[in-house]
Amino acid sequence: MIILGIDEAGRGPLSGPVVAAGVILDPEKTIDGLADSKKLTEKKRQSLYEVITAHAKAYTIVEVSPQQIDQLNILQATLKAMNQVADNLKGQFDKVLVDGNKLPNWDYNSEAIVKGDSKVQEISAASILAKVHRDNICLEHDRLFPQYGFAKHKGYPTKEHLENIRKYGVLNIHRKSYKPIQLLL
């Protein structure tokens, strides 16, 4: 059975997109070191990202913008991204395994697995792709808006990030539907 593993990154931050990734691994090849992306160092994630993208049978990465998150809400934006991931790889898998406890409303043979990023290698691989991709977006945001410190906090609601928003203002990459941002508008 060919498995498509899906995971997301970036539901909690105040800025940037939510990112979903899907990975189909070659069952003949194992990738050592796969784990939940949150349990890996940044260097290890980057190294595994290169290995996964080079050796996966197929993968895709989907972003949903802060503006779409504001229109839909974060749950619906995440489900939309996951749905797009599956549609992008349609016909290449038998079953979809998704990290978490919610599935998009779709017709795919699928299962939601709580802590799937620690249990299923395809989900672990998707977790790594989503996290590295989103972190790279945050590094680009840091280059564009260095005074906000995106390289450090990756958009999460840290004390520093909130202080910088107060000091420099809300950007178009901030999620305006999120309460901490609404309070600063």
From Swiss-Prot:
CDD domains the UniProt entry points to: RNase_HII_bacteria_HII_like (cd07182)
Highest taxon of source: Bacteria
SUPFAM superfamilies xref list: Ribonuclease H-like
Enzyme Commission number(s): 3.1.26.4
Chain positions recorded as a divalent metal cation binding sites: D7, E8, D99
Reaction(s) this enzyme catalyzes, per UniProt: Endonucleolytic cleavage to 5'-phosphomonoester
Free-text function comment from the UniProt entry: Endonuclease that specifically degrades the RNA of RNA-DNA hybrids.
Protein name: Ribonuclease HII
Gene (name only): rnhB
